Design a protein with these regions (language model features):
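Rhodanese-like catalytic fold shared by cysteine-dependent sulfurtransferases
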Residues: 1-39, 47-88, 95-132
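Active-site flanking residues adjacent to catalytic metal/cofactor-binding acidic residues
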Residues: 42
Length: 132
């Protein structure tokens, strides 16, 4: 199968569409929610990135598995997602988590937020980190 260029929609278009539909949260605001009951931080980075450190208490849900982990009908479903009253998604810099937030909203989740700047911004703000 060959790809005819130009693409109908590139990654910049997809990010722009997702950003128009999702809510974001600053690192400063997210830090205040870190130990709040019902708030779940979800790390959508790949396993090798996650192994290098994470936000304490976060759920690892790699972007490629998110739909399966979020769907209660799937055997891979993670109960933590359904139980959370607020979900804060993050990746390295915010791109993948933007698309992940849009995906969860499309699936019917509410109170979903993308961490602006991702883990890079979290580190810059000296947010706490834990070993995976």
């Amino acid at each position: 199968m060959s790809l005819s260029l130009p693409l109908n929609k590139g990654f910049k278009d997809m990010l722009a569409e997702a950003n128009a539909d999702i809510e974001t949260i600053s690192v400063h605001a997210a830090l205040k929610l870190l130990e709040e009951p019902g708030v779940l931080f979800v790390d959508v980075r790949e396993a090798h990135e996650f192994a290098a450190g994470m936000i304490p208490g976060s759920l690892h849900a790699p972007r490629g598995y998110l739909e399966f982990l979020a769907d209660p009908e799937c055997s891979m479903h993670r109960d933590e997602l359904a139980a959370a009253s607020k979900i804060i998604l993050f990746c390295a810099t915010g791109g993948r988590s933007t698309l992940a937030a849009k995906t969860l909203m499309d699936m019917g989740y509410s109170e979903v937020y993308n961490l602006v700047g991702g883990l890079a911004a979290w580190r810059a703000a000296r947010g706490p980190l834990a070993a995976a």
